[in-house]
Amino acid sequence: MTERWTRERRMEQTRTVLLDAAETIFASRGYAGSLEDIADAAGYTRGALYAQFGGKDALFLAVIERHRQRFLDGFADVMASFDRFADVDVEGFAERWRLLSGADAQRAAALNYEFTLFLLRNPDARDRVAAQRRETVRSLAEYIAKGIARLGGSLKIPAESLARVLLATNDGVTLASHLDGEDLYRTFLQLVLSSVGPPED
């Protein structure tokens, strides 16, 4: 039992290190980043990479899936940090949103744009991740609906529509803020919060 547990932990650690390296390479070099570079950065062989993921497409999609889950977890934490909608401070909310993508928001946004380009250029991959994308929207919409209800507000538009807009625009706000040197998070959140009203009777 101990041997099996150790083997499983070792495989899990290998997978995590490979994903970390792949995320760095894909964000800095795009999908064109080579498997050799990823394996070297992780300190493993290409054989270990293939054993874990089977190929480049599967590795890239695994990186994106992990990144999306981090975003969802972070969003849930942001929503949980407020008790009432009336007490939501836009500046504080904007700061939390700014940190939502992690320590390197620009890299995270670049990775998401690379993923979008990958799907546009690879219809087969788009079909493979369609269910994952729907689940991301569904999960985010659920967080939004439950969070707004808990805060004592109501949505003026469907939660799923707002979720799609957030996913579609968040990376653009991040990159534009970085490239233009102007913080757009506050303005962005003012637009988002305009879709929230008082509780329904």
At which residue positions do the language-model features occur?
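N-terminal intrinsically disordered/low-complexity leader segments
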Residues: 1-13, 201
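Helix-turn-helix
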Residues: 13, 17, 21-58, 62
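Short amphipathic alpha-helical elements of helix-turn-helix/winged-helix folds
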Residues: 21-25, 139, 169
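Short, basic, alpha-helical segments at the C-terminal edge of helix-turn-helix-like DNA-binding modules
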Residues: 35, 65-71
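Hydrophobic alpha-helical connector segments
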Residues: 62-65, 75-109, 159-166
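Amphipathic alpha-helical segments used for helix-helix packing
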Residues: 89-90, 103-127
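Short, solvent-exposed amphipathic helices
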Residues: 107, 128-135, 139-142
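Hydrophobic/aromatic-rich alpha-helical bundle segments in the mid-to-C-terminal region
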Residues: 126-130, 134, 148-201
